[in-house]
């Protein structure tokens, strides 16, 4: 069987929960052939893998959403759309019922010049219709260029050559969901969507926090992600969520209930038995571990501020931030600077480590994320008999406080961005 894994912004370029899950799944089925279709920001990331690919990965295909060469790709071929193609494009821009298969066929069969399409008459008139009907109070030139920048990555996805496979497995909706839908349409393979976080909600949270995006354009972007998710849900043969509430959100966002199933995360708990104890020096502290990537979605700045607040009240505390800090170097630099400015001692940024070397002597672990699914770091902490402090996001409440059981609490839950 030939299985195409479609991922956006994670495996095999970035270490993290979803990437680790994909890597483990591929290794679990050594007799199956896997191909990767990896969606990344730009060509600078090409081939820079954070994982050694298993032997049963036979191909890697890359899609660049910020492709500097988009204007020269497939140059100067057909730009005038047929009536049904224009209707599908206009419906897409107006957030109406979109004939996605018409768009799939148009981009696949016509050697489309994305430059010609975005700068051409048909796209201009469709944008003008959307503007007149829905957004007449904003500056048209700004609206036009926003729509071009918004639809560039989608059109790049639609113009991608889809490798043939028996199964297409997207680990999110969004652009990965579009690719999976196209794979099913063109090659008649089965299509599975497995969401670890709810993609649309995560993008919405990022947009709400973004200061550089005007409110009107935030709403336009949010609707864009919602309709992309909806086509994936409608096309997929099965859609999995990590826990019950996640599936409820997927249904609200348009997934037919009969397609939904809960597939919770799991870990090899035996790896966390008889973990090494810490050194006598480390045992002098109350050790707090954070197994996280240093990225905005993990809200490391709140973690640092919370530690500073607690350190003043309990000088024996020591914080270990265990995870890579090269994914978003500017944000990581801001975190390092914040720790220096707050004059906090006893914070260690370890980089990527084997967590089993550390968990055995942690007194607790902490997670300050603004968005999560069902965090593996919490499951690993529990396997190591370590309690957890976590924000009330994703399935953290169910993990810490239980769901229909009487085991009691396994930690403390708090709201996001709470330094106290």
Identify the residue ranges that each predicted region occupies.
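Short acidic alpha-helix that forms the nucleotide-activated donor recognition element
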Residues: 230-234, 351-362, 383
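Carbohydrate-associated surface elements
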Residues: 245, 266
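Conserved donor-binding/catalytic core segment of Leloir-type glycosyltransferases
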Residues: 276, 280-309, 320
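Glycosyltransferase donor-sugar binding loop
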Residues: 318-333
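Nucleotide-activated donor-binding/catalytic signature segment of Leloir-type glycosyltransferases, i.e.
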Residues: 332-352
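Aromatic "clamp/platform" in nucleotide-sugar-dependent glycosyltransferases that forms part
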Residues: 370
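Short hydrophobic beta-strand element within catalytic cores of glycosyltransferases
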Residues: 387-390, 394-400
């Amino acid at each position: 069987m030939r299985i195409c894994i479609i991922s956006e912004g994670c495996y095999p370029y970035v270490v993290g929960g979803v990437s680790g899950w994909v890597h483990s799944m591929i290794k679990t089925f050594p007799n199956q052939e896997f191909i990767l279709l990896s969606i990344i920001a730009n060509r600078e990331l090409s081939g820079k893998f954070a994982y050694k690919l298993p032997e049963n990965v036979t191909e890697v295909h890359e899609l660049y959403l910020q492709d500097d060469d988009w204007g020269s790709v497939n140059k100067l071929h057909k730009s005038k759309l047929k009536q049904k193609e224009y209707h599908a494009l206009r419906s897409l821009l107006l957030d109406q019922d979109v004939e996605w298969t018409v768009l799939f066929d148009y981009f696949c069969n016509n050697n489309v010049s994305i430059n010609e399409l975005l700068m051409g008459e048909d796209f201009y008139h469709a944008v003008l219709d959307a503007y007149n009907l829905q957004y007449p109070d904003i500056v048209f030139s700004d609206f036009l260029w926003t729509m071009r920048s918004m639809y560039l990555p989608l059109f790049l996805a639609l113009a991608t050559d889809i490798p043939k496979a028996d199964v297409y497995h997207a680990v999110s909706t969004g652009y990965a969901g579009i690719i999976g839908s196209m794979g099913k349409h063109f090659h008649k393979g089965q299509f599975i969507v497995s969401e670890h976080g709810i993609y649309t909600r995560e993008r919405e949270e990022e947009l709400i926090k973004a200061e550089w995006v005007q409110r009107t354009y935030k709403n336009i972007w949010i609707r864009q992600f919602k309709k992309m998710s909806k086509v994936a849900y409608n096309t997929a043969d099965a859609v999995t969520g990590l826990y019950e509430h996640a599936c409820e959100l997927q249904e609200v966002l348009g997934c037919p209930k009969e397609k939904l199933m809960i597939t919770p995360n799991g870990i090899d708990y035996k790896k966390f038995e008889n973990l090494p104890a810490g050194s006598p020096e480390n045992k002098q502290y109350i050790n707090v571990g954070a197994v996280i990537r240093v990225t905005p979605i993990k809200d490391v700045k709140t973690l640092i501020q919370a530690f500073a607040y607690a350190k003043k009240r309990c000088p024996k505390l020591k914080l270990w931030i265990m995870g890579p800090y090269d994914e978003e170097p500017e944000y990581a630099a801001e975190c390092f600077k914040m720790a220096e400015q707050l004059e906090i001692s006893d914070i260690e940024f370890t980089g990527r480590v084997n967590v089993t070397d550390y968990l055995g002597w942690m007194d607790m672990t902490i997670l300050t994320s603004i968005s999560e699914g069902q965090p593996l770091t919490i499951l690993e902490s529990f396997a190591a008999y370590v309690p957890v402090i976590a924000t009330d996001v994703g399935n953290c409440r169910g993990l810490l406080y239980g769901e229909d059981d009487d085991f009691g609490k396994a930690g403390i839950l708090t709201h996001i961005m709470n330094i106290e």
